[in-house]
Amino acid sequence: MFVHCTSNSDDRQVMQFIGDEMEKRGYNSLYGAADHIIFKNKKAISILDGHEGEIDFIFRFTPLEWLKDIKPKTWDGYFDTITPSCNHPVAIFAQTKRFPLIWESLKKNGIKLDTWEKLLPHTILVKDLKDKEGYIYKPACGRVGEKISIKEACDEEEYNLILKDVKRHPNDYLAQEKFISMPILSPNKEEYHVCIGSYTVEGKHAGFYARISKKPRIDSHALDLPVIIERG
């Protein structure tokens, strides 16, 4: 089943394209939301009308930060199902901003985190921020730059709303030491802040993607860019 946000037409277009290609190769494609699957004996079962029964494979396109908010909590079966899954939700361990909070425990168990510690800004619980300066708030499971309190990247109304939400729901946020983003100059002499990410398949690098913004925050208003590598 191609699991996606069924109310979003752009998500459905992506799923439909991949599903059509799978159909050409002899597979049957089902399209549903995350709660259209239940789990029995750790096997994924479709509850779609007319398509009830065990399914052979899960392709998850629904973002984890949305999946976790589904009620009732039927989504936990995605984590330990024996049904083969693409885009496995175990990846949330590195997606959540809470990851640094378990580093000490991981290091005690022999896991090396030298690169993480070198590159990731210092991260603490909101309650531990107190009078420390130079920190910003980030949602623990945020996406596309939403609710990140970089003051110069927010208008006054948005900034104040973020601070109010942090006070109401401190456990939904982390405090992270702010770093200064250095913009690059475009050919038309405009400054842009750049974020480059890496695609992986089976834990191996499979390509880059990039987004740029005139503000020092990569959010839903940022532009997508291809990444072209020139080999000498």
Please place each PLM-identified region on the residue numbering.
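Domain-scale recognition of functional cores that engage charged ligands
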Residues: 1-232
